[in-house]
């Protein structure tokens, strides 16, 4: 078995007032892991379009290994605008390529060689990518030192209690910030307790 570290989920373009740049938490995770000299992969999907080709070219230029399928959906974009106070507002396009990541034979082979994977909630907003992520997690060999990192990304209304609970069950590492802890506490009925205890309660959802 290899010690491959995977970032799985959305790979997209953030379209900012000053121009576009590649975004997506899983892609960023895989890139930063690679900068420490580890063998990483980005697993996602892009469209058969110019924006998709650009993403693949940028990753290739950065020498970032990928397993990205080109599918019959447009490459994902996030339109970023600033309100009157300079706070960014995000419009995440739906029905895009990373909503439709296929589970291929090649992806199955990668799962069998993966030591750690980081996945989020945003890429599970569509049942196709959600099923692929869960199948990848289930295919990974059950060995000591294996990491299944759930990076909660509560964006717009692209999450549900059921999807979050399922991911709690499948992960063994949970990445969550204070703001997300408050949202989780309301969703799962933990009001009136401190953030540390909310974190413990969230972890108990795995049991």
Go through the PLM ranges and name each one.
Residues 1-6, 58-60, 66-68, 84-206:
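Ribokinase/PfkB-type carbohydrate-kinase core domain
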Residues 4-5, 14-87, 94-101, 105:
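Substrate-binding N-lobe of the ribokinase-like
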Residues 11-13, 34, 44, 171, ...:
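Generic helix-packing signal
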Residues 9, 44-46, 152:
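Short beta-strand/turn micro-motifs composed of small residues
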